[in-house]
Amino acid sequence: MIDLIDVSKIYPVKGSDDVVALDHVNLHVKAGSIHGIVGQSGAGKSTLIRCLTALEKPTFGSIIVDDIDLSQLRGRELRQARRKIGMVFQAANLFDAKTAGENIEFPLKVAAKKEFTREERKERVRELLALVGLEHRGGAYPSELSGGQRQRVGIARALSDTPQVLLCDEPTSALDPESTRAILSLLRQVRDETGVTIVIITHEMSVVREICDSVTLLKNGGIVQSGTIEEVLADPGSPLAKELVPAPSVDELDVADFNRELTDREIAAQSSSAEPKTSAQASEDGNILLDVIFTSHPGVPTGSNMLNLAAKLGADVTAGTFESMGSVQVGRLALAIPAAQRSSIIDQLRAQGAHVEVRSL
């Protein structure tokens, strides 16, 4: 459905180095999927979405939507191709002087004026209001709607001309948690009922966990990692996998305590009935804290099996999280283990397919 082939976008700067906003980006988004694009500010997300909507032309490369290279189109052909792409903004960007229904109808009156009669437009508006759960609010003005309701109107407006692709630019970042969950559920419903391909630009990994089938991580204009959720989680030590399943919270003082070497005073206190220990020997009496990530793909233990293994190895589970994303169950544990058994325990955990790191402050 969507293919970016070696796409670069470079902005020349007079008297300074050029700004490379996108750097040889290659990406495939499957038809009918929900794909997340994540990254910090300056990663290239905004430039990418402007290129996808053909508001910006890439300096190099091709952007293909439904087998049409947008970067090669001009004039009327480009305007027609853009109609295949609907856009949902961070703020709904509704016309304040128009009702919800009139906002939804507006694209049909402008871009498709000759293709629909007035009655056909009104019927389309009724269908879309029902789809987004606002069938009784079509006559309300934006000022009379909540933030979540305004975003629903924005989604309906983006769908008015029956696009094949729906681009969502930070669609939930201005919403409260309850409205965020409702909008994400609506987007999934829209995909399921219409078959539209959805691309979500976001900095919130919770959005990816909740709704996406696949995800791409951008950094400095390039792709760091990309794949389906299952592919990403199959490599639990990868940057995206670590972001998708955050490390369970452990008090920093506990982390420091688990990783510290015993002080000379503690060494002396332990030496009443034995020869004083050296610092190196004493450090072997302490604990260290491990960060363990595992998934339930074939050949890897489930969460309960991993907990049983941790207990068998003498590890103390100080915190843990378990998530189900797509067809994969993924878990992340903070394990306190005896420093003297570090190598043996880490080897046994890794032998079971877990990704293991020593946590530090």
Tell where the protein language model's regions lie, with residue ranges.
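Conserved ABC ATPase "signature" region
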Residues: I68-D69, E105, K109-A112, R118-H136
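Helix-to-loop junction immediately C-terminal to a conserved catalytic motif
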Residues: T53
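Conserved signature/switch motifs of ABC ATPase nucleotide-binding domains
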Residues: A140-S143, S160-D161
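ABC ATPase "signature
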Residues: S226-G227, D235
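ABC ATPase NBD coupling module
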Residues: L70-G86, V110, R118, V232-P236
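A short, surface-exposed alpha-helical micro-motif characterized by mixed small hydrophobic
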Residues: V208-E210
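Catalytic Walker B motif of ABC-type/P-loop ATPase nucleotide-binding domains
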Residues: L166-D169
